[in-house]
């Protein structure tokens, strides 16, 4: 059997073939669905940072992705081409469904298209030139729109599933090793202001931001324990 080399062109083609049908799942699925998958308790429930299907609390771009996620809607809207391009096969039907969802019976395609044009400046989607009723999602722009809130909610949900560990137990767990300075000690990857800037949340328990004085005490305790162990060994 003849083997074909895997080139960069092949990789690019594979990515393009996936197109929007793979990328849009980022915005309809739960980003914490697999978080703690192996160890979550029965009371743990995932967060849905988007909206539930059928909900009226939805934006137009989310609604379009919802329609595109169901192959039963291919008679009115469908993916076309690559990299997030889609076409309104029956624009009047799409507009009717959007009006039904938002309780606006007078909705039509003219109004819907004006709403879509609002997304151009937001880098959420663009009109495909030369093709009627064809649009293209900009997933980089969508990521910028969605990521801040979803990340913060996922982190907050993640930390809420853990009981705080008392500070007195840090030295017993040997979490502070010799040579680790205050600036390098952080439970979460990233600085607290970056992760908690919107809600003024504090990092979980003692691990997020332990003061320099606390760290100094713990290091001193560890040093004394090590010294006592050495003395006991020779005595």
UniProtKB/Swiss-Prot annotation:
Keywords annotated in UniProt: Developmental protein, Differentiation, DNA-binding, Neurogenesis, Nucleus, Transcription, Transcription regulation
Tissue specificity as recorded in UniProt: Expressed by serotonergic neurons in anterior and posterior raphe.
Positions in coiled-coil regions: none
KW Lyase (keyword) present: no
Compartments in which it is found: Nucleus
Recorded superkingdom: Eukaryota
Residue range(s) of DNA binding per entry: 58-138
Main location: nucleus
GO (cellular component) term, any one: nucleus
Family: Belongs to the ETS family.
Descriptive protein name: Protein FEV
């Amino acid at each position: 059997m003849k083997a074909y080399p895997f080139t960069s062109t092949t990789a690019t083609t594979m990515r393009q073939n996936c197109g929007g049908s793979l990328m849009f799942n980022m915005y309809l699925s739960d980003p914490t669905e697999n978080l703690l998958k192996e160890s979550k308790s029965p009371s743990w429930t995932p967060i849905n940072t988007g909206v539930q299907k059928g909900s009226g609390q939805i934006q137009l771009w989310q609604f379009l992705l919802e329609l595109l996620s169901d192959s039963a809607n291919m008679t009115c809207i469908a993916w076309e081409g690559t990299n997030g391009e889609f076409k309104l096969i029956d624009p009047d039907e799409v507009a009717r469904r959007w009006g039904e969802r938002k309780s606006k019976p007078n909705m039509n395609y003219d109004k819907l298209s004006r709403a879509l044009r609002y997304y151009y400046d937001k880098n959420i989607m663009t009109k495909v030139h030369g093709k009627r009723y064809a649009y293209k999602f900009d997933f980089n722009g969508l990521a910028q729109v969605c990521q801040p809130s979803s990340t913060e909610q996922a982190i907050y949900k993640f930390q809420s599933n853990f009981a705080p560990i008392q500070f007195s137990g840090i030295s017993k767990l040997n979490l502070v090793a010799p040579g680790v300075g205050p600036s390098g000690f952080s439970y979460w990857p990233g600085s607290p202001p970056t992760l908690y800037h919107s809600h003024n949340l504090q990092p979980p328990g003692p691990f997020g931001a332990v003061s320099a004085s606390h760290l100094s005490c713990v290091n001193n305790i560890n040093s004394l324990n090590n010294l006592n162990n050495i003395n006991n060994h020779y005595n």
